[in-house]
Structures are given as structure tokens and as C-alpha cells.
């Protein structure tokens, strides 16, 4: 079966950000077609939740593709339309099991031109561990 898939090219106009592609539930064929459509519009391809099998297929197609295995993300091209902001975002993960999601968030922010800093495994069960990062995260004004 070949279901229609559509990329939201108007998202940048509405939100200032290009759409990320959720790779987990898409076939290799769908990811290939979506990537080709996005590249044809001179936009960056950002695929999240992609496994190594799908990523390796796209890496073979696109020499300038980069796979970030720990984040389960693949990027093809460069974002030439980054946000112009001096804001900084802190990304805080409670445990090491959150690493992939933390790295995905960091990649997304970096692609869009947002300065960020990740704090990995700060602990949520022990308040003393989280509080020890307060002096680093408060100046950011944005915490994920």
C-alpha cells in the first residue's frame, strides 16, 4: 500500500520552525519520499525516532546525511533559516534512561538555532541532586 503523506511546509510561516519527521511509524519508502520532497524545497530534513535500519538506508542515499544513533535522529542538509535569538534553553533529564529524548531535544533546538545546554541524569527522586543544578539552569529562563 502507498498511503499519501504530506509535509507541513507552511509550519515555518506559522511557527518559525520547519516540521520534524516522526520516523518510528513510517516505512523506508515514506521516509525516502518525504526526504526527497523536503530537500527539493531546500529545507533541512530532521527525522526523529528513526532506527538504524531506516537511517542506514537514507545514509546510503544522501552523502550529507548524519545519523545520531544515541538520539535516534537523522539530519540531511543544513538549516539555512535558523531562528535569530539570544535565548538559551536548559534541557534537564531526570535519569539516564531519558538520554535519547534529551539528545533529540538538544538536536532539535540546535537545528533551529537555539542555544541550549543539557543536564543529564540530575535525579528527580533525590531533590538534593536536582537543586545542585539550580545556579546553572535559572539564568536560561527556559527549561525542558
Which role does the model predict for each range below?
Residues 11-14, 58-90, 94:
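Arg/Lys-rich RNA-binding interfaces used to dock onto structured RNA substrates
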Residues 25, 50-52, 72, 95-96, ...:
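Short, ordered loop/turn segments at secondary-structure junctions
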Residues 134-140:
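Conserved small/polar residues in nucleotide/adenosyl-binding loops
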